[in-house]
């Protein structure tokens, strides 16, 4: 394993117009302050205020959106980062680990990774993801790309269909089909930051949001050594060259993760588990008293001095005393949150330090809060109660099904652009309106300029004479549609679907 020196990981250079020369501690901190400004002021962050956390299209402002959730994750991430640095300082390891002049950037990278961790999520969350992937699977049949004979291939797109005697081209077609059928919020976040928004963040800051290290076009089993890290797609074929460069800049082995990403992940796990339960009480899905009984029953074994007693029972008893003249709900969640943080944050920090050689190396194949401890059990308790009593609630399920239908319907509406021939679509891109394609012209006009420019730039880098040109052009055209629809807020997607389906 490599010697632990965070100066080799906290890389303050950028992909474009990077600062040159040796920098002082203050100058490096200013570079990361610039990252903070770029992130906080980006439209992608603002759009989170109208994207779902648990309850789609929620009008109650007290219920969390992706933005308020991300701000809470940011605060917990900062807390964990400070706890880690404080413990390393006590152990007199800051200088040995190259962190004595990088504590500010360390905290900032964690905070901004937390704030950005959901920016790639489509409308209606996981149901939006499922709708996109199901829609493309029904047309591209990625599983058929492995079939023999090739005549069994049911792919509906000529440019992506496998052909005899074209093995190198077929390999590209397989990759493209697999990639397009594995839309994922984390991978879309990388695409947003680099390709669509062109934020030109430091290498270290982008490393912080590369949560999963599996390429979206991956086929077959993942290696056991990286099974957790490769649990989901982390980036698309379109960003593969950028990720390759990122790995070099951050000294990451293939399929390995940037060290500070584990902190962001732990902060997210801690935040959403309590928040989902609080939102459910706000929505009157159950009362605080009912929630306490759900938690009590699900914990199972009750022993004096257990973590459940210290965290949940303590919050329940204090909320019933009503010593602060606040509602029982407010008091219960205040104490539950404080108790949970006070137990889980130090534990996550210690897990980070105890496993630092593997974490620094990028190969620690677990989450910080995923082990056999009672701390991990407490998080699982919150998650299981939410799954059983919140996510399965009829109101929540109905909204999720509506969200799935909205995203599927929007893809159906924009399908004429994907049915156009390469020559016809190229003409439409150049002229923006083509008289013999009235529907397609109007649909194309609705696409955002940012997404259209990303398509044009990607295709302009291809050689029209190359045999793979039709395949890759179609790939970027599909990305254009996925980018546009996944970038919508819940409310915009809902309204757009109703308008275009003429139901208003």
UniProtKB/Swiss-Prot annotation:
Keywords: Hydrolase, Magnesium. It catalyses: dGTP + H2O = 2'-deoxyguanosine + triphosphate + H(+). CDD domains: HDc. GO terms for biological process: dGTP catabolic process. Its cofactor is Mg(2+). Its EC number is 3.1.5.1. The keyword Transmembrane does not apply. The keyword Magnesium applies. It comes from the Bacteria. Residues 66-273 form the HD domain. One of its GO terms (molecular function) is dGTPase activity. Pfam families: HD, HD_assoc. SMART domains: HDc. Homotetramer. dGTPase preferentially hydrolyzes dGTP over the other canonical NTPs. NCBIfam families: dGTP_triPase, PRK04926.1. Belongs to the dGTPase family. Type 1 subfamily. This is Deoxyguanosinetriphosphate triphosphohydrolase. It comes from Citrobacter koseri (strain ATCC BAA-895 / CDC 4225-83 / SGSC4696).
């Amino acid at each position: 394993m490599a010697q632990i020196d965070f100066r080799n990981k906290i890389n303050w250079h950028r992909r474009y117009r990077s600062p040159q020369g040796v920098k002082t501690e203050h100058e490096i901190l200013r570079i990361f302050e610039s990252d903070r400004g770029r992130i906080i002021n980006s439209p992608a962050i603002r759009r989170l205020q109208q994207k779902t956390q648990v309850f789609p299209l929620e009008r109650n402002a007290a219920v969390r959106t992706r933005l308020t959730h991300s701000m809470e994750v940011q605060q917990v991430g900062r807390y964990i980062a400070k706890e880690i640095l404080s413990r390393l300082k006590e152990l007199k390891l800051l200088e040995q680990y190259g962190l004595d002049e990088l504590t500010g950037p360390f905290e900032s990278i964690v905070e901004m990774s937390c704030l950005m961790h959901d920016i790639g999520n489509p409308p209606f969350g996981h149901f939006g993801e499922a709708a996109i992937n199901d829609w493309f699977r029904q047309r591209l049949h990625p599983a058929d790309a492995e079939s023999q004979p090739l005549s069994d291939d049911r792919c509906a797109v000529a440019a992506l269909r496998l052909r005899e005697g074209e093995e190198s081209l077929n390999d590209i077609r397989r990759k493209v089909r697999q990639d397009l059928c594995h839309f994922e919020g984390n991978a879309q976040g990388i695409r947003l930051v680099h390709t669509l928004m062109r934020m030109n963040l430091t290498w270290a800051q982008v490393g912080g949001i590369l949560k999963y290290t599996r390429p979206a076009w991956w086929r077959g089993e993942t290696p056991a050594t990286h099974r957790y890290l490769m649990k989901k797609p982390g980036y698309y074929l379109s960003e593969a060259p950028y990720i390759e460069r990122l790995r070099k800049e951050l000294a990451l082995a293939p399929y390995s993760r940037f060290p500070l990403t584990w902190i962001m992940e732990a902060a997210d796990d801690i935040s959403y588990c309590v928040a989902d339960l609080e939102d459910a009480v706000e929505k009157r899905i159950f009362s605080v008293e009912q929630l306490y009984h759900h938690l009590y029953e699900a914990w199972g074994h009750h022993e004096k001095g257990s973590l459940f007693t210290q965290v949940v029972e303590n919050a329940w008893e204090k909320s019933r005393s009503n010593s602060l003249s606040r509602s029982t709900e407010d008091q219960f969640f205040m104490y539950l949150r404080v108790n949970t943080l006070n137990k889980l944050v130090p534990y996550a920090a210690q897990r980070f330090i105890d496993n630092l050689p593997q974490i620094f190396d990028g190969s620690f194949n677990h989450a910080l809060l995923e082990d056999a401890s009672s701390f991990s059990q407490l998080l699982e308790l919150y998650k299981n109660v939410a799954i059983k009593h919140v996510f399965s609630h009829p109101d929540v399920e109905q909204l999720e099904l509506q969200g799935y239908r909205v995203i599927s319907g929007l893809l159906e509406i924009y399908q004429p652009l994907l049915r156009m021939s390469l020559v016809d679509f190229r003409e439409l891109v150049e002229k923006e309106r083509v008289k013999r394609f009235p529907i397609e012209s109007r649909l194309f006009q609705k696409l955002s300029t940012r997404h259209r420019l990303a398509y044009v730039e990607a295709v302009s880098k291809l050689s029209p004479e190359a045999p793979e040109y039709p395949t890759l052009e179609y790939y970027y055209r599909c990305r254009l549609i996925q980018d546009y629809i996944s970038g919508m807020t819940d409310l915009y997607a809902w309204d757009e679907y109703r308008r275009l389906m003429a139901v208003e």
